Structures are given as structure tokens and as C-alpha cells.
Amino acid sequence: TASLQYLSVLAVAAVFLQLTFGALMRHTYSGLSIPDFPLAYGQIFPSLSNDAIASYNYQLILEGIKWTGDKPVAAYQIFIHLLHRYWAFIVAGIITLLGFRLLALKSLPKYLRNTGYLLLLIVTIQFTLGIFTVLSRKEYITTSFHVVIGALVLVICVITSLRIARLRWLNKYFGYDEK
């Protein structure tokens, strides 16, 4: 279970970093800098040139997301938004892998295997909420649930990692099998 322990610690670190990117996005007002999903202004990696940024700002005004008097979206805001968005795919992959590994290891206690189902469910909910946060133009209920579920994902990953570490410790020093 050493590799499982490393994977669970990686999940904790990845989720923590994702929450940091989310906080950075919130505090730099980057949440509405990209109005579409799955692409960003119709591209995987939108241009951050001055002309492109001017075009994006005009598009945001036409779509009613920004007003002409609002501060225009800057390249750094789009970059931060993309960082949070694309890192989410990596985090979802790590948590999905951890969830399936927990389910596959029949030697694990039932509570740890069941945590695999919980991880798969919660990462699916969180990913879906992230998509709807963008598509709803940061509607406050959707956005609030996205933030709360993000914190819950971190808590579940930390507890899972601690449970795996405890199991490894008990097995190593006492030959204890917690089935």
C-alpha cells in the first residue's frame, strides 16, 4: 500500500493547489474572464495578445457579462482562470485514479474501499459544479456549492490519506489486518 499512500498524498497536494488557484481566481476577479466551456473564447489556449484581449472584452460587453464602465479583463485574469480550469482536469484524474485503486484492492478494509466510491462521486459533483459555475456566469448558489464541495474534497482526501497511513503503520509494526 506504499504506492497507494503516495497517491493519496499526491491527491491532497493537488487539491490544495487547486483550492489555492480557486482563491487566486476569486480574489483577482478572474472568474468571469472566460465565459464559455469547454473551450475558452472558442480555443483550447486563447491568445493573450493585446488585440485578442480587446476582442474578448468587446465580446463580454456584447454578451452582457461586462458593462462598458467595468474594468476590462486582463491577460493575467484569463491565465489564472485557465490555470484553475486545466489543473482541475489533473486533479480529477488523480482523484479518479485513487478512487479506482481503492476499489480494486480487495485486501483493504471495507471502509477504505467504500471511500473509493465517495471519491468518485464527489469529484464528479465538483467537476460538474465547476462547469455550471462558468456556464451560469457565476450564479451565487452554484458558485457557493462549488467552493464548499471543493473544501469537502480536500477534507475527504486528507482523511483518506491518514487512514491509509494508519493502516500501513499498523501492518508494518503489528502485522495488524483491519478487515
Question: What is each model feature region?
Answer:
Residues 1-179:
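Polytopic transmembrane helical bundles with strong interfacial aromatic enrichment
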